[in-house]
């Protein structure tokens, strides 16, 4: 029976198929070519068959008579067309049923034989197609249907004729059963009349109609608006076929009226067999079906006979060879699809067949998956033919993959497959996820409503890394924990994420189709409020349901947020400005037409209206008469028709929209769907082709601005050309005549391939290749090129801005032409234009996200242009950032849009270096929103902006500072807030992704920090910043950090992205505190004073540049540190600061104290180095946090005096006994600096010096530090000493207090004194002795602080060596915290001795030449005694605490001891018992073991200790500062500290215990020095062991190393080292309460003996004195040179370096001295290494140049290039490195060399730095003020790069 049935069915089907084959192929929705040819004629002639009652037949329980009608009989249609359209199998699972075969009217005609409706047999329910839920539900980004008519054809229709489509069941039984039929059994012939192609027929069942209805009202229409009846409800109401027919006819009639371009749902269009251009799906073509060229995935042969049951099936005979096209797994479908050679070899039959009927050929096809019951063709049974083996493994693998592929559902269930969230159509996403509103919106809105009532919410941007992390979490369909403390510290990241989500929607929340409706509604006269409200309600109701629900929720949320405008400053108007570009976008605007300018203001007005009246608009909708009027009942056809007419107008796109869409299709169309093609639409064709095509087709159309419908009707050819292709990233204008050609040869891809041949590598590197693409800025490929590229990019962007503006004045066609040509032009200008142009933007990236980006770039470029200081650059940069190609090339599907945009930005940015480009990309988007918003969306981005801007700033020296530097950091501020924010958010994400992509690269890591550093929050202060730009620029890095700090007035934690991770929660959380803003302001003020010095501009440049380069590098060298770096804590100084900021812990709200604290604590480590530099600078400059330099600069002016007062108080506290006061004391000098110009300068210098150590890690900081050290240090340190003394006076006698505080203050004062003592004493001779002594103390303390920071950073850079030292130092610090008071006293005594000694020394080298010579002599001479004293003191402390570590001290004598000394001295404030020997031993013995523990404890401590640190009781810190100075610069201290003892003898006398211990310590140091001389190499190498500690304490280690290396640098480096040491002490003291990042922890970990501290202090004072004499001249020359000119400084430094070469020889003679210096150098070299690393990628060239100059001069430029610290460190490291080189201090030298030689990875930089340490010249360079050198180098680098 079954045979009979199958035979009869087969005969009928084949006969029918034969006819259809003759008429033409049969096509279906799936487009599978179907050509069934009857095998025999008799089958076709077979009489009607009567099915015997088989189970399937029983379901029908009737005889079915089938009648085959020849194709000729069809009057209007070719048989193939009609039948192809009726391919049921493609739409419904019922397709397999025999009812699909043409019904034949038999003896028993059905009651309604002509009825168009057919009942489908129930016998077969299996579907050969995956279920709908298995199919991807997607939405087109652009749809251009035009008028669409869908009609139901009845039997009378001429189109139907007697076609098989009018099939009906025959027979009485079937008829009667059918009369009581269910609508589901009905089939309909539907005629689709699209505008752009001939009408065609499709066959659909009632079930299909229900599906259509469901999809329409789930994705497109609200039923109340559509007026369509619910088909499911109708099913129960339709008793007869006629009722069903009538209902369906009316339904389709209504649908035809409302159908418009809003039908973006791919499922609906596929149902209609239409593509998004209104054309029939290509596969419906009979010709295409017959000539199918789909590649086969396997070969099979028939093992069972199968006769086609439907037109889209093929017959299989046993033995037939079949090429399998699609082989779904049995779980998905039993149906395979393949093609079979016909009897005529030239023809193929293509169709479906059961997989059980064939057996695959080849043993490589895995058949282990379950097969259907009849496994006749199982692999085991199928013979293996070698015929396909020749295809090789690739084919076999592909086939096996296809065969074994899991189903979508299974992939989803397993979590492997996830639907996109970002950059996914809203309706598509909600349908796929089953949510009413996006989870992103719900989660973020709830979080912001709970925690986000803060200033600038939605205006400021969050940290890019956090945004990216959140984005990835949502894309992975998991809701991140927004309630964790880390996120609460960066609330702006959540708000940025939310804006980014809406910005990247392919179809905006307020859809393209309704854009004009919104505009019309809002343009109603104000006096017609009711009318406006009514129109707005109607327009909102027209939104697709998902959009409506989402908009309602969002508007209500924004309304709630606006109610807190008193606290947030975000009124409904401000929110509208920020949100408008994310919610409303016009195709015309995105296409870059003149309308781009037109809609910006309107968007904000519409958004504001929606926010203000959300309750009226949305809540009243249900009761609104308009809404009910929209609802049409099936019974009220007239009402429906009338409503439909009205709705038709509203629902269909207006002509302007159509025109815009057409234009987009022509110009942007290509760009619109880059998601299909990663290639940008604009790049698909050559520039000439694009221009020609635009002029030929689009030009006229665009000029005419005709609606698409008009266009199509008017010129069918043009229209067809325009919309004849599926949108795949390019419109017809860009697409070649052949669609496949477009796919095969996208221009953008072609360009990319050559540029990015190693594309996979480029993804992970910051190389400019990413930016290579079109941008003519390929210059950025090199680091130096990147600088130049940035400059050129900025220029290009300016040009582009002008072009963009010009574009708006030109006809759209011309504009599009220009845009296209520009986009395709590989010129920077063109690149910018392209990126700006919507085409290029969309084309470059996924059309969805990129189109938004491009929209913002293009749209906001003009808009933002006025808002931004450099709008054109913003535009071009943004545009570049949003290149779609670039994003798509990103390959990062999770964050496609983010990655894509950043990559696009890179391509566009290529002018900048890869890192520069990347930074630019971030910076620009960030800058745009951040400047306008006064907050860079993400600190990371801003740093890049700052970096970019710094490059610009370098290019335009002073202006860049205020304009470029400020602009870059505040570039976001400049740009329109809302749009910029959007861009910025996207860029943030993109950049974050890029960072993740390139995180391996040194640049990338620093970039992260840069972004943090760049967090300028308040654009309003930006004007002040612009004025203060010298400060901000001198705080180049601080600009970045300041940006972030400013921007994150509360979550400043961003700055230390990675290093902060541990601290981040606290830091950011603390930072959130409002204190941070005031503190930031103060900090800014401090940097401003610094810049106010002559060095303002110079400092500005170097810092800015360093920010760019250094920050980037920072990330790599100290990923851990960045997380921990307390950039935010610095900013958060008011609140509990990060582990780094002990000062922050002090109740002081002075940001400067915070800066000092964080800098001192070194928590900021590398990532916070920029911040720390800025902190130090800012602290000294009366701004505690560099990060807030810009904003705080503006605010600092206001808060400057307060900051000074605070700083004074903090200094008093520090001077008193506060470990925290150490850091606060630095801030106090900064405040004083703010008060006094000289003081400001000195503070700025001190800050620069302080940050210089930090800067050693960060090239950016370094250059900034260098400049301050050059100018600010000389002045600043003097004044700082004075100020410190003043503060000390307040708390106690200036000297006495200062001596006590000096332990904290001395490091920076010593550094300042060292670098400034010569200058300062010479320049300010009247205070020369006293002031110098004061400075020496203050400088020593500040230097110690700064040095501590720098050492920490350097240690991070040189974490290997540093690790040991830091561990020991941390231990010392831990133990030394309580001994800090004793140590402070001892250090004070030592300082007194040093003071005297330094006074003498200072008097000796009053002349610069003398100073250079003296410096060398001093280094050789004094290091002996002074260093011995220091060493003795340190040794005592260390020995007491770390006797077992003595060996290590010997090994690390030069490296670890200096670091240890610094740490000890820092620690002395904490624990006077800290022993250098123990410290050294610890470092030597178990660097890794100790370091990690200390690192964690330190970090934890830093986090916890800020509160304690805030307690002034840590007054002993001053002694630790001195100890730090001595330890960090053991040689330096031995030189300077002895000088200090001489100069500051009075103060040191106060610390009698210190002085008493000093001799012992000195002797011990002397003995140790000797051992250290030989152990120096070991120390240098042991730090290499430190890597174990590097993870947690990499920064700390590096800092320690830097401190050592810096110590030899008696001048600036010594000061820096001392400052670093002091910071370490402060850190240690802070570590007791708040272990500073890495270094501080190390310091706290090690308890320095007071004696050792005293010895260290003495040594350091002597060293400082000597360095003051020698280094002051050197540092003065260097500082002056740096301040005056980077190149001059380099020259002088080279001279110095020569003298140092002599000194090196002398040092070799004096091994002890050299060893001492080596110890110091160890820290310095580490600093150098760290600095080099910091400069590594972003500023490698700069750093190298600096290094060379510095080494040429006096300081080792390697270290110098590494950071500001390296400048100072170079001074101390000079001798130390010389010694180290003698003893193999290679670990330090390599970094120096690296920086010198060329931009390298930070590791290389470290190596070079070490290598240079080995080199005598390099060591001497380290001895010289590394800050100045590094800053100079960074400045040069920046300038060269910019130029």
From Swiss-Prot:
Residues 94-117, 746-780, 894-975, 1013-1106, 1721-1745, 1779-1829 are annotated as: Disordered. Keywords: Coiled coil, Developmental protein, GTPase activation, Phosphoprotein, SH3 domain. Residues 295-363 form the SH3 domain. InterPro entries: PX-Rho_GAP, Rho_GTPase_activation_prot, RhoGAP_dom, SH3-like_dom_sf, SH3_domain. GO terms for molecular function: GTPase activator activity. Signal peptide: none annotated. GO terms for biological process: retinal ganglion cell axon guidance; small GTPase-mediated signal transduction. Residues 1058-1069, 1793-1806 have a biased composition (Basic and acidic residues). PROSITE patterns: RHOGAP, SH3. Residues 1378-1404 form a coiled coil. It comes from the Eukaryota. Residues 759-771, 928-939, 1071-1097, 1779-1790, 1807-1818 have a biased composition (Polar residues). The modification Phosphothreonine is found at residues 843, 1118, 1121, 1679. The record marks 459 as: Arginine finger. SMART domains: RhoGAP, SH3. The modification Phosphoserine is found at residues 166, 168, 180, 837, 840, 851, 861, 872, 876, 1029, 1125, 1216, 1281, 1284, 1453, 1456. Ubiquitously expressed. Residues 424-618 form the Rho-GAP domain. Pfam families: RhoGAP. Residues 1029-1053 have a biased composition (Low complexity). CDD domains: RhoGAP_CdGAP (cd04384), SH3_ARHGAP32_33 (cd11835). PANTHER family: CDC42 GTPASE-ACTIVATING PROTEIN, GTPASE-ACTIVATING PROTEIN CDGAPR. Probably functions as a GTPase-activating protein (GAP) for RAC1 and/or CDC42. Required for optic stalk formation. This is GTPase-activating protein CdGAPr. The gene is CdGAPr.
């Amino acid at each position: 029976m079954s045979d009979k049935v199958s035979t009869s069915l087969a005969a009928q089907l084949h006969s029918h198929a034969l006819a259809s084959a003759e008429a033409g192929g049969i096509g279906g929705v799936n487009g599978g070519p179907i050509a069934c040819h009857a095998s025999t004629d008799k089958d076709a002639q077979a009489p009607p068959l009567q099915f015997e009652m088989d189970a399937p037949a029983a379901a029908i329980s009737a005889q079915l008579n089938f009648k085959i009608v020849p194709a000729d009989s069809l009057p209007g249609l070719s048989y193939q067309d009609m039948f192809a359209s009726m391919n049921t199998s493609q739409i419904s699972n019922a397709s397999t049923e025999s009812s699909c075969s043409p019904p034949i009217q038999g003896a028993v005609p059905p009651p309604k034989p002509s009825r168009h409706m057919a009942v489908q047999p129930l016998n077969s329910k299996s579907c050969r197609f995956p279920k709908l839920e298995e199919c991807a539900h997607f939405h087109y980004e652009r749809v251009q249907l035009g008028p669409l008519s869908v009609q139901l054809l009845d039997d009378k229709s001429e189109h139907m004729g007697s076609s098989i489509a009018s099939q009906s069941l025959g027979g009485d039984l079937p008829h009667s059963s059918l009369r009581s039929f269910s609508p589901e059994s009905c089939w309909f012939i539907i005629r689709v009349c699209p505008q752009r192609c001939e009408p065609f027929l499709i066959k659909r069942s009632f079930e299909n109609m229900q599906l259509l209805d469901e999809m329409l009202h789930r994705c497109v229409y609200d039923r109340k608006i559509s007026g369509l009846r619910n088909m499911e409800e109708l099913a129960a109401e339709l008793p007869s076929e006629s009722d069903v027919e009538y209902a369906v006819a009316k339904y389709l009639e209504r649908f035809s009226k409302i159908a418009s371009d809003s039908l973006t749902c791919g499922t609906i269009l596929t149902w209609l067999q239409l593509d998004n251009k209104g054309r029939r799906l290509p596969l419906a073509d009979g010709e295409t079906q017959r000539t199918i060229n789909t590649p086969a995935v396997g070969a099979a042969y028939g093992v069972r006979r199968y006769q086609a049951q439907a037109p889209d099936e093929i017959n299989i005979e046993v033995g037939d060879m079949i090429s399998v096209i699609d082989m779904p797994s049995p779980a998905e479908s039993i149906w395979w699809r393949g093609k079979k050679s016909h009897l005529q070899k030239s023809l193929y039959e293509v169709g479906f067949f059961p997989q059980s009927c064939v057996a695959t050929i080849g043993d490589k096809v895995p058949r282990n998956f379950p097969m259907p019951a009849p496994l006749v063709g199982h692999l085991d049974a199928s013979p293996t033919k070698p015929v396909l083996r020749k295809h090789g493994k690739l084919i076999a693998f592909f086939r096996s993959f296809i065969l074994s592929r899991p189903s979508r559902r299974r992939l989803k269930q397993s979590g492997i497959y996830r639907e996109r969230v970002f950059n996914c159509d809203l309706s598509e996403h909600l349908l796929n996820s089953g949510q009413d509103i996006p989870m992103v919106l719900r989660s973020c809105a709830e979080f912001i409503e709970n925690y986000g009532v803060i200033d600038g919410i939605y205006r400021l941007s969050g940290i890019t890394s956090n945004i990216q992390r959140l984005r990835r979490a949502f894309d992975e369909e998991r809701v991140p924990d927004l309630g964790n403390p880390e996120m609460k510290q960066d609330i702006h990241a959540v708000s940025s994420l939310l804006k980014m989500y809406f910005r990247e929607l392919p179809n905006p929340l307020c859809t393209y189709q309704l854009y004009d409706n919104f505009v019309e509604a809002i343009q109603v006269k104000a006096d017609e409020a009711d009318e406006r409200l009514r129109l707005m309600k109607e327009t909102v109701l027209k939104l697709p349901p998902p959009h409506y629900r989402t908009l309602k929720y969002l508007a209500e949320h924004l309304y709630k947020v606006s109610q807190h405008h008193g606290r947030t400053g975000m009124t409904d108007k401000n929110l509208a400005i920020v949100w408008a570009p994310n919610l409303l976008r016009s195709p015309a605007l995105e296409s870059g037409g003149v309308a781009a300018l037109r809609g910006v203001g309107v968007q904000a007005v519409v958004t504001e209206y929606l926010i203000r009246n959300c309750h009226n608009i949305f809540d009243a909708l249900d009761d609104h008469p308009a809404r009910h009027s929209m609802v049409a009942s099936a019974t009220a056809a007239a009402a429906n028709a009338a409503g439909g007419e009205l709705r038709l107008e509203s629902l269909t796109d207006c002509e302007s929209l159509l025109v815009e869409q057409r234009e987009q299709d022509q110009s942007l169309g290509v760009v619109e769907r880059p998601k299909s093609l990663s290639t940008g639409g604009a790049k698909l064709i050559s520039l000439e082709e694009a221009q020609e095509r635009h002029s030929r087709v689009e030009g006229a159309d665009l000029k005419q601005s005709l609606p698409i419908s008009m266009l199509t009707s008017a010129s069918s050819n043009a229209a067809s050309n325009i919309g004849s292709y599926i949108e795949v990233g390019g419109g017809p204008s860009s697409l070649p005549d052949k669609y496949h050609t477009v796919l095969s040869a996208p221009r953008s891809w072609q360009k990319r391939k050559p540029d990015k041949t190693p594309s996979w590598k480029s993804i992970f590197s910051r190389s400019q290749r990413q930016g290579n693409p079109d941008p003519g800025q390929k210059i950025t490929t090199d680091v130096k090129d990147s600088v130049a590229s940035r400059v050129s990019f900025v220029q290009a962007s300016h040009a582009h801005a002008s072009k963009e503006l010009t574009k708006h004045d030109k006809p759209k066609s011309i504009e599009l032409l220009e845009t296209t040509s520009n986009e395709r032009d590989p010129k920077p200008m063109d690149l910018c234009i392209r990126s700006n142009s919507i085409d290029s933007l969309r084309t470059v990236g996924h059309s969805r996200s990129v189109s938004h980006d491009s929209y913002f770039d293009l749209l906001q470029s003009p808009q933002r242009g006025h808002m931004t200081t450099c709008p054109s650059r913003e535009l071009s940069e943004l545009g570049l950032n949003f290149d779609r190609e670039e994003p798509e090339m990103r390959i990062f599907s999770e964050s496609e849009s983010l990655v894509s945009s950043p990559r696009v930005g890179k391509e566009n940015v290529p002018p900048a270096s890869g890192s520069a480009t990347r930074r630019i990309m971030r910076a620009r988007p960030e800058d745009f929103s951040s400047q306008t918003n006064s907050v860079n969306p993400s600190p990371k981005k801003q740093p890049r902006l700052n970096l970019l801007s710094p490059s610009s700033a370098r290019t335009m020296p002073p202006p860049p500072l205020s304009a470029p530097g400020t602009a870059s950091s505040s570039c976001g501020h400049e740009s329109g807030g809302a749009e910029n924010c959007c861009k910025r958010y996207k860029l943030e994400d993109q950049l974050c992704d890029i960072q993740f992509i390139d995180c391996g690269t040194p640049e990338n890591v620093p970039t992260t920090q840069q972004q943090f550093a760049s967090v300028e929050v308040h654009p309003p202060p930006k004007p002040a910043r612009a004025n203060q730009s010298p400060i901000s620029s001198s705080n180049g890095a601080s600009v970045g950090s300041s940006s972030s700090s400013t921007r994150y007035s509360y979550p400043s934690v961003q700055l230390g992205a990675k290093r902060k991770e541990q601290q981040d929660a606290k830091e950011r959380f603390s930072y959130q505190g409002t204190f941070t803003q005031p503190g930031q302001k103060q900090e800014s003020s401090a940097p401003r004073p610094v810049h106010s010095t002559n060095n303002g501009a110079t400092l500005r440049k170097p810092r800015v540049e360093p920010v760019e380069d250094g920050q980037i590098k920072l990330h790599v060298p100290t990923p851990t540190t960045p997380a921990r770096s307390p950039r935010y804590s610095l900013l958060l100084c008011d609140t509990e600061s990060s582990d780094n900021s002990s000062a922050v812990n002090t109740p002081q709200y002075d940001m400067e104290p915070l800066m000092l604290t964080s800098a001192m604590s070194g928590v900021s480590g590398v990532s916070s180095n920029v911040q720390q530099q800025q902190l130090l600078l800012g602290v000294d400059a009366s701004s505690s946090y560099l990060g807030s330099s810009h904003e705080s600069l503006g605010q600092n002016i206001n808060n400057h005096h307060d900051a000074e007062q605070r700083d004074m108080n903090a200094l008093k506290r520090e001077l008193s006994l506060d470990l925290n006061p150490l850091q606060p004391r630095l801030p106090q000098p900064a405040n004083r600096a703010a008060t006094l110009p000289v003081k400001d300068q000195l503070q700025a210098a001190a800050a620069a010096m302080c940050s210089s150590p930090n800067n050693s890690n960060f090239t950016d900081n370094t250059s900034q530090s260098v400049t301050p050290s050059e100018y600010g240090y000389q002045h600043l340190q003097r004044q700082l000493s004075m100020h410190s003394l003043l503060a000390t006076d307040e708390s106690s006698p200036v000297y006495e207090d200062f001596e006590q505080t000096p332990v904290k203050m001395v490091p920076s004062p010593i550094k300042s004194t060292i670098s400034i003592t010569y200058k300062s004493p010479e320049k300010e001779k009247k205070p020369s002795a006293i002031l110098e002594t004061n400075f020496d103390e203050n400088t020593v303390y500040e230097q110690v602080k700064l040095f501590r920071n720098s050492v920490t950073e350097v240690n991070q850079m040189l974490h290997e060596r540093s690790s040991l030292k830091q561990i020991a130092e941390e231990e010392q610090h831990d133990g030394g915290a309580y001994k800090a008071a004793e140590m402070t006293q001892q250090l004070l005594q030592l300082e007194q001795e040093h003071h005297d000694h330094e006074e003498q020394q200072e008097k000796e080298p009053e002349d610069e030449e003398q100073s250079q010579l003296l410096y060398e002599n001093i280094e050789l001479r004094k290091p002996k005694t002074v260093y011995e004293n220091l060493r003795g003191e340190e040794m005592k402390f260390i020995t007491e605490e770390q006797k077992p570590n003595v060996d290590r001290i010997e090994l690390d004598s030069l490296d670890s001891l200096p670091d240890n000394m610094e740490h000890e001295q820092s620690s002395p404030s904490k624990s006077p018992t800290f022993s250098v020997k123990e410290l050294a031993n610890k470092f030597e013995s178990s660097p890794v073991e100790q370091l990690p523990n200390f690192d964690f404890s330190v970090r934890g401590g830093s986090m916890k200790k800020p509160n304690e640190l805030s307690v002034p009781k840590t007054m002993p810190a001053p002694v630790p500062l001195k100890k730090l100075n001595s330890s960090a610069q053991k040689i330096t201290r031995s030189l300077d500290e002895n000088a200090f003892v001489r100069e500051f003898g009075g103060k040191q006398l106060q610390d009698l215990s210190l002085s008493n211990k000093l001799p012992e310590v000195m002797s011990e140091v002397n003995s140790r020095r000797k051992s250290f001389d030989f152990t120096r190499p070991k120390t240098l190498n042991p730090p290499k062991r430190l890597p174990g500690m590097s993870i947690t304490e990499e920064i700390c280690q590096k800092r320690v190393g830097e401190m050592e290396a810096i110590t030899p640098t008696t001048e600036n480096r010594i000061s820096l080292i001392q400052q670093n040491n002091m910071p370490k002490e402060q850190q240690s003291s802070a570590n007791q309460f708040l272990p500073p990042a890495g270094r501080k922890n190390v310091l706290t970990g090690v308890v320095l003996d007071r004696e050792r501290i005293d010895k260290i202090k003495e040594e350091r004072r002597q060293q400082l004195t000597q360095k003051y004499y020698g280094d002051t001249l050197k540092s003065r020359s260097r500082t002056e040179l740096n301040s005056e000119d980077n190149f001059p400084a380099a020259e002088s430094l080279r001279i110095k370096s020569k003298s140092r070469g002599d000194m090196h020889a002398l040092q070799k003679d004096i091994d002890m001295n050299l060893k001492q210096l080596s110890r110091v150098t160890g820290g310095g070299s580490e600093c150098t290494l760290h600095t080099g690393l910091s400069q590594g990628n972003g500023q490698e060239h700069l750093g190298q140049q600096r290094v060379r100059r510095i080494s040429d001069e006096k300081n080792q430029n390697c270290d110098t290039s590494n950071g500001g610290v390296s400048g100072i460190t170079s001074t101390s490291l000079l001798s130390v490195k010389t010694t180290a080189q003698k003893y193999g201090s290679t670990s330090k030298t390599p970094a120096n060399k690296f920086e010198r030689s060329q931009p390298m990875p930070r590791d290389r930089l470290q190596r070079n730095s070490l290598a240079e340490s080995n080199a005598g010249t390099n060591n001497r360079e380290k001895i010289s003020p590394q800050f100045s050198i590094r800053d100079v180098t960074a400045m040069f680098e920046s300038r060269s790069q910019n130029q």
